[in-house]
Amino acid sequence: MILVDWQIMDRISRGQIKVEPFEPGLIQPNSLDIRLGDHFVWYVPGDRVIDPYDKESVTAEVEEMNANEVILYPGQFMLAETKEVLSLPDNVVASIEGKSSIARLGIELHQTGGWIDAGFIGSITLEMCNVNQRPVKMYAGMPIGQLVFYTTERAEQPYNLKQDAKYQGQRQATLSRYHENQRFIQ
């Protein structure tokens, strides 16, 4: 079941869903708007291959900054963070969606990582890309996306109890930690 405005507010007021900082005006009929944080990470353009199983190649030739505004250039991929830190109970999951007004500028908010598991605690890393033909300026604190909350049965092992919860507790834009996964290919 998707939570509606009063259910979102009720769960936040009772501490079942935690959002810091919380702004009641960001609650929408079926979602909670989230804002852009001020930490940004991107890969320096080049020919170096990124191997997801090799931590050094994942973390090499990366730039990052904290700023109140950032320009995303055509074709550029950038990681960012949400201003909000989220804490989900073991029976609520969330999905992140872009705001239509931002999408109409050519900004994709997430590539495929739009699912937030029950038990997750942390800021959300955004995988942004500009598919417009023109640069787009964005500001820390601007509403950029929305979280849709779903109730589920209680997870037997929520994300916060998993031994391999790679992104639990993250507080800034976080590079891929795929290299920490067990390797299944031959």
From Swiss-Prot:
Catalytic activity: dCTP + 2 H2O = dUMP + NH4(+) + diphosphate
Active site: residue positions: E127 (proton donor/acceptor)
Uppermost EC category: hydrolase
Function: Bifunctional enzyme that catalyzes both the deamination of dCTP to dUTP and the hydrolysis of dUTP to dUMP without releasing the toxic dUTP intermediate.
InterPro entries membership: dCTP_deaminase, dUTPase-like_sf, dUTPase_trimeric
Stated family: Belongs to the dCTP deaminase family.
Protein name, UniProt field: dCTP deaminase, dUMP-forming
Entry-linked Pfam families: DCD
Alphabetical list of HAMAP family matching this protein: dCTP_deaminase
Residues at the site labelled Important for bifunctional activity: G114, W115
GO function term, MF aspect, one: dCTP deaminase (dUMP-forming) activity
Coiled coil: none
Organism: Methanosphaerula palustris (strain ATCC BAA-1556 / DSM 19958 / E1-9c)
Complexes and interactors: Homotrimer.
